[in-house]
Swiss-Prot record:
It comes from Methanosarcina barkeri (strain Fusaro / DSM 804). This is Pyruvate synthase subunit PorC. SUPFAM superfamilies: Pyruvate-ferredoxin oxidoreductase, PFOR, domain III (SSF53323). It also catalyzes the oxidation of 2-oxobutyrate. Keywords: Oxidoreductase. It comes from the Archaea. One of its GO terms (molecular function) is pyruvate synthase activity. It is an enzyme of class 1 (oxidoreductase). Disulfide bonds: none annotated. It catalyses: 2 oxidized [2Fe-2S]-[ferredoxin] + pyruvate + CoA = 2 reduced [2Fe-2S]-[ferredoxin] + acetyl-CoA + CO2 + H(+).
Amino acid sequence: MKEIRIHGRGGQGSVTAAEMLSVAAFEDGKFSQAFPAFGVERRGAPVQAFTRINNNPIRLRSQVYTPDYVIVQDATLLETVDVASGVKDDGIIIVNTTENPESLKLNTKARVMTVDATKVAMDIIGVPIVNTVLLGAFAGATGEINVESIQHAIRARFSGKVGEKNANAIQKAYKLIRGEEA
């Protein structure tokens, strides 16, 4: 089973990202679940959302404490939240930032990867909403989910131009994190 923890701020779409990742996993023929972890937080407060993906039914119902993968939607969270907490040594942490991975100095043995998802979102979607963009980066970095499945899940959730722009941004982030585009 693969476990993913998404760090964001209230209103950034962390829960939607976890749900779309779960739907994409289902599209790939896998079992999945997605759920948030927040209380009475307001817009802008740190939140977490989780996705589990497995080839067999998932019976576990607890929060994710030792993720294989971590997605950080807002790099300012690195100052206040230990995003690397519990991540497996062979895991991957994907951070939305203009910085290079080495400059982040995260206390982890996991591989740290960065992508400027905000720029991709602004250039293609026209708004700084990075949740879907980072799912493309996740697909490219991990190979756990087909990028086409993520695009299909997004198009099913957001119709018309919004869905298409998001699908294009997903493809761009997928290529960026794999080093296929500059």
